């Protein structure tokens, strides 16, 4: 009889563990050496049932999470693959505590759920020319570092386009961009981590030469097209 009761308890408790849903707006802090860094996470399920999210921290607002994994009460997520956060939801689902990996260090964090998720829709651009649509690669020289950037612009049915820029050497950080094209002139505004780009597309449609600007600093940036 005792074994049957224990089995019943296990069967009853298993669905409760699976039902834990981290959707919502979370606010907390990461314990850095000598100080705390405040940050916020927004998590919500897509129509397909997958978990999506965004992080806001230190001047970055609503940066898309590249990965969100939930298993029972365990959760792991990141916007940069080299800066993952792993944690555990409290039994009442009101808090998440765990560790963040930053610059190779494991640092504790804690968050509390404060309300509903505040996710913004993916920004759309007007459709671009065939010469601009596609994948472009460039390299930034900044503060003694060489950072590879990848720009993708994809036209969508209905006359819109989706733009993204990937910082390859910063954990694959991927940010949405709003692209505006007027003839050979191309501008884009970077979302999440503010920045902008202005450039000129050459006659052959193989090179985009311009300047990337962030926090008042402008840096030359030339993109070349990936072969179609």
Which sequence ranges carry the predicted segments?
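Short beta-strand edge segments in extracellular beta-sheet folds
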Residues: 112-116, 224-228
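N-terminal targeting/docking segments
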Residues: 5, 116-120
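Sec-dependent N-terminal signal peptides
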Residues: 4-13
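Sec/Tat signal peptide C-region and signal peptidase I cleavage site
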Residues: 15-19
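Central antiparallel beta-sheet cores of small beta-barrel/beta-sandwich binding domains
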Residues: 20-92, 97, 101-103, 120-203, ...
């Amino acid at each position: 009889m005792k074994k049957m009761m224990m089995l019943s308890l296990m069967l009853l408790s298993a669905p409760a563990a699976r039902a834990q849903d981290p959707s919502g707006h979370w606010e907390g802090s990461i314990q850095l050496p000598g100080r705390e860094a405040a940050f916020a996470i927004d998590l919500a399920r897509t129509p397909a049932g997958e978990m999506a999210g965004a992080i806001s921290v230190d001047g970055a607002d609503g940066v898309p999470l590249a990965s969100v994994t939930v298993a029972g009460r365990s959760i792991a997520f990141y916007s940069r693959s080299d800066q993952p956060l792993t944690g555990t939801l409290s039994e009442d689902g009101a808090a998440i505590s765990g560790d963040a990996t930053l610059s190779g260090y494991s640092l504790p964090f804690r968050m509390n759920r404060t309300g509903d998720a505040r996710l913004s829709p993916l920004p759309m651009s007007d459709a671009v020319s065939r010469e601009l649509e596609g994948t472009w690669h460039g390299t930034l020289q900044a503060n003694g570092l060489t950072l590879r950037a990848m720009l993708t612009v994809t036209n969508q049915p209905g006359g819109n386009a989706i733009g993204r820029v990937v910082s390859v050497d910063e954990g694959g950080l991927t940010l949405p961009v709003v692209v505006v094209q007027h003839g050979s002139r191309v501008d884009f505004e970077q979302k999440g981590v503010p920045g902008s780009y202005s450039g000129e597309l050459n006659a052959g449609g193989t090179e985009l030469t311009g300047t990337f600007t962030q926090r008042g600093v402008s840096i030359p940036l030339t993109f070349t097209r990936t072969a179609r």
